[in-house]
Amino acid sequence: MEAKVMNATEKKELMGKYTKKLENAIKREASVMKEIENDKALIKYLEGQKTSGAAFDNTVYESYDAWIETIRKQIKKSESTLTNIEFKKVELEAIQKYIA
Protein backbone atom coordinates (compact mmCIF):
# COMPACT_ATOMS: atom_id res chain seq x y z
CA MET A 1 0.00 0.00 0.00
CA GLU A 2 1.39 3.34 -1.03
CA ALA A 3 1.26 6.24 1.40
CA LYS A 4 -0.43 9.39 0.12
CA VAL A 5 1.81 12.42 0.07
CA MET A 6 0.05 15.55 1.29
CA ASN A 7 0.41 18.79 -0.59
CA ALA A 8 1.15 22.08 1.20
CA THR A 9 -2.53 23.10 1.38
CA GLU A 10 -3.52 19.78 2.95
CA LYS A 11 -0.68 20.03 5.46
CA LYS A 12 -1.70 23.55 6.46
CA GLU A 13 -5.32 22.47 6.84
CA LEU A 14 -4.31 19.56 9.06
CA MET A 15 -2.03 21.76 11.16
CA GLY A 16 -4.81 24.34 11.48
CA LYS A 17 -7.00 21.69 13.09
CA TYR A 18 -4.16 20.76 15.44
CA THR A 19 -3.87 24.38 16.61
CA LYS A 20 -7.33 24.09 18.19
CA LYS A 21 -6.11 21.19 20.32
CA LEU A 22 -3.06 23.17 21.39
CA GLU A 23 -5.15 26.25 22.21
CA ASN A 24 -7.44 24.18 24.42
CA ALA A 25 -4.46 22.71 26.28
CA ILE A 26 -2.98 26.17 26.79
CA LYS A 27 -6.27 27.44 28.25
CA ARG A 28 -5.70 25.09 31.21
CA GLU A 29 -2.67 27.07 32.36
CA ALA A 30 -4.55 29.34 34.76
CA SER A 31 -6.42 26.45 36.38
CA VAL A 32 -3.20 24.43 36.79
CA MET A 33 -1.50 27.42 38.43
CA LYS A 34 -4.49 27.79 40.76
CA GLU A 35 -4.28 24.07 41.64
CA ILE A 36 -0.61 24.50 42.58
CA GLU A 37 -1.44 27.54 44.70
CA ASN A 38 -4.25 25.67 46.48
CA ASP A 39 -2.06 22.60 47.04
CA LYS A 40 0.71 24.72 48.57
CA ALA A 41 -1.80 26.38 50.88
CA LEU A 42 -3.13 22.97 51.91
CA ILE A 43 0.39 21.77 52.71
CA LYS A 44 0.94 24.81 54.96
CA TYR A 45 -2.36 24.14 56.70
CA LEU A 46 -1.62 20.43 57.20
CA GLU A 47 1.88 21.16 58.47
CA GLY A 48 0.35 23.61 60.95
CA GLN A 49 -2.16 21.01 62.08
CA LYS A 50 0.61 18.43 62.46
CA THR A 51 2.85 20.84 64.40
CA SER A 52 0.04 21.88 66.72
CA GLY A 53 -0.67 18.25 67.55
CA ALA A 54 -4.20 18.32 66.15
CA ALA A 55 -5.77 14.88 65.97
CA PHE A 56 -5.56 13.31 62.52
CA ASP A 57 -9.11 12.75 61.34
CA ASN A 58 -8.96 11.42 57.79
CA THR A 59 -9.90 7.97 56.53
CA VAL A 60 -8.12 8.32 53.18
CA TYR A 61 -4.56 8.90 54.41
CA GLU A 62 -2.62 7.17 57.17
CA SER A 63 -1.06 10.34 58.56
CA TYR A 64 -0.39 14.01 57.95
CA ASP A 65 2.95 13.03 56.41
CA ALA A 66 1.31 10.66 53.91
CA TRP A 67 -1.23 13.32 52.96
CA ILE A 68 1.45 15.99 52.56
CA GLU A 69 3.59 13.65 50.45
CA THR A 70 0.65 12.96 48.13
CA ILE A 71 0.04 16.68 47.69
CA ARG A 72 3.74 17.27 46.93
CA LYS A 73 3.50 14.64 44.18
CA GLN A 74 0.43 16.39 42.78
CA ILE A 75 2.36 19.67 42.74
CA LYS A 76 5.20 18.01 40.79
CA LYS A 77 2.70 16.68 38.25
CA SER A 78 1.12 20.12 37.92
CA GLU A 79 4.53 21.75 37.46
CA SER A 80 5.27 19.22 34.73
CA THR A 81 1.95 20.12 33.11
CA LEU A 82 2.96 23.80 33.16
CA THR A 83 6.24 22.92 31.44
CA ASN A 84 4.29 21.03 28.77
CA ILE A 85 1.97 24.00 28.31
CA GLU A 86 4.96 26.27 27.73
CA PHE A 87 6.16 23.87 25.03
CA LYS A 88 2.68 23.87 23.48
CA LYS A 89 2.79 27.68 23.32
CA VAL A 90 6.03 27.52 21.32
CA GLU A 91 4.62 24.77 19.13
CA LEU A 92 1.44 26.78 18.50
CA GLU A 93 3.44 29.87 17.55
CA ALA A 94 5.52 27.84 15.08
CA ILE A 95 2.43 26.26 13.51
CA GLN A 96 0.69 29.63 13.20
CA LYS A 97 3.71 31.00 11.35
CA TYR A 98 3.75 27.93 9.10
CA ILE A 99 0.07 28.14 8.15
CA ALA A 100 0.06 31.94 7.71
Region locations from a protein language model:
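Residue-level detector of intrinsically disordered, flexible termini
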Residues: 2, 24, 40, 53-54, ...
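Short, flexible coil/linker elements and helix-boundary hinge sites characteristic
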Residues: 4, 19, 37, 50-53, ...
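Short, charge/polar-rich alpha-helical segments
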Residues: 3-41
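Extended alpha-helical coiled-coil "stalk/arm" regions
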Residues: 29-68
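Amphipathic alpha-helical coiled-coil segments
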Residues: 28-29, 66-99
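Generic detector of low-complexity/intrinsically disordered segments
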Residues: 8, 16, 24, 44, ...
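N-terminal compositionally biased, intrinsically disordered segments and leader/signal-like regions
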Residues: 20, 52, 60, 71, ...
